[in-house]
Swiss-Prot record:
Family per record: Belongs to the GatC family.
Keyword vocabulary terms for this entry: ATP-binding, Ligase, Nucleotide-binding, Protein biosynthesis
Protein name, UniProt field: Aspartyl/glutamyl-tRNA(Asn/Gln) amidotransferase subunit C
Subunit structure: Heterotrimer of A, B and C subunits.
Gene Ontology MF terms: asparaginyl-tRNA synthase (glutamine-hydrolyzing) activity; ATP binding; glutaminyl-tRNA synthase (glutamine-hydrolyzing) activity
High-level lineage: Bacteria, Pseudomonadati, Chlorobiota, Chlorobiia, Chlorobiales
Native source organism of the sequence: Prosthecochloris aestuarii (strain DSM 271 / SK 413)
GO biological process: glutaminyl-tRNAGln biosynthesis via transamidation; regulation of translational fidelity; translation
Length: 95
């Protein structure tokens, strides 16, 4: 499998990216190098190798959930530079 400049242009469009011709060429080369490396992994002989599902025998090693005091809404908002009712007000980021 290989990536073409057309593929890179399509992926860039989906990601809302713009590449110059040189960047598009570089991205095509780099993606093809990655795919070539992944193809090399397919050549590794894994016969007789058990699949690894975990590196240790412990199961569900999680802390116990417990309630802890937290800030109430007013306390959290008291130093906010701008707020609207019970919410932080921030500048628009996405146009």
């Amino acid at each position: 499998m290989s990536v073409t400049k057309k593929d890179v242009a399509y992926i860039a469009e989906l990601a809302k990216l713009r590449f110059t011709e040189a960047e598009q060429e570089k991205m095509t080369t780099e993606l093809n190098a990655i795919l070539h490396y992944v193809d090399k992994l397919n050549e590794v002989d894994t016969d007789g190798v058990e699949p690894l599902s975990s590196i240790h025998d412990q199961v569900n090693v999680l802390r116990e959930d417990c309630l802890k005091p937290s800030l109430d809404n007013e306390e959290a908002l008291k130093n906010a530079p701008d707020r609207q009712e019970r919410f932080f007000r921030v500048p628009k980021v996405i146009g």
